[in-house]
Amino acid sequence: LQLKDAKELLGDDYGNLYLYKNKDLSFTKYDSVGNQLGQLMLTFPYKIQSVNNPLNIVMFSENAQEIKFIDQNMNEIQKINLSSHFGFIKAVYAEDLQFAWMIDESNKTLIQYNFRSTSKISSFPFNINLTSLKDFLVYNNRVYILRENTFEVYSTKSALLYSAPISNSKKLRRINNDIWIFGSQTIDKFDGKDLSKIFEKKKKKIV
């Protein structure tokens, strides 16, 4: 695999690999031995939510204000234009194959959205500073925010419950009840109370 300029490298439950490059906005699928299975050329930058289920890959573009759904052949199967329903959506967390959480920056709200029926399930006032926001997720009525140099936990009412400095952070993932924070060379784990480092390789790069 050509990992130069790779923004993200992801793997699904069937051993396939997905490479997203910000430089040319390409999203490419490979099998386990590196054979290319498909490629999608995008017009805007997108954040890949998850590829665990390769039949339905969810991706979000802040620039385009839309959510795309991609099938196993890297074909677009659905697109939702968020600007026709909401204000400016800063970030999206796809909770599963039906629901997503979204932060509406212009209206200062946290929204739970059913993207299958395109209906709003619930919304909460969520007035926090979104400067340098890199990723977020929602689990058990807690909102986990990853910034350039900080990891924060909020209630759905915007109350700050936890904050810790962190460097070179890239993305958040939920593993069972824990929140994992992936950096360029480290992985940290938040167990609901404390943050601990569980992996570090100075000469390696986590994509």
Describe the function of each predicted region.
Residues 1-2, 34-41, 76-83, 117-128, ...:
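A short beta-strand motif characteristic of beta-propeller blades
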Residues 3-12, 44-51, 86-95, 129-140, ...:
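Repeated scaffold domains used in trafficking and secretory/extracellular systems
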Residues 21, 30-31, 61, 70-71, ...:
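Structural recognition of the beta-propeller blade-terminating site
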Residues 28, 66-68, 109-111, 152-153, ...:
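WD40 beta-propeller blade core
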Residues 56-107:
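Hydrophobic alpha-helical segments and helix pairs
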Residues 85-157, 162:
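A charged, solvent-exposed segment within the mature domains of Sec-exported extracytoplasmic proteins
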